[in-house]
């Protein structure tokens, strides 16, 4: 789609890291965002927005284990579920992406429509273990997964891999 109304970039692990080195994809994201009403990402999709130059000097978020890697792209990382900075929105992870999506639904279709959507998807979070205690986060486990994803996804891009790995 050459000029989408909205652009949403999903995240992931090795596949997303590979996408960072796909110049054609990064160029498309940059060009599509130039005309889109809104550009958004979920989870590590924000790294692709960063690679496209869309996060420079903007507040942004991503999965907590990759949060500091946003600095590599000139972003101002913030630890929030989702962030809106102008026409660019970023969500920290999958569940936070639902929060951001409901915000966008309200923006585009009104709060009543967004509430209907919330009922339609039965979104009423009740985590079985309560809220997260970020001081107890299994950082080494997730940083190990991040390092593995970067190693696999950016095997042919050693300089970028090294810069991002240093931020984990």
Briefly describe each language-model feature range.
Residues 1-168:
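Active-site-adjacent pocket-lining segments in enzyme domains
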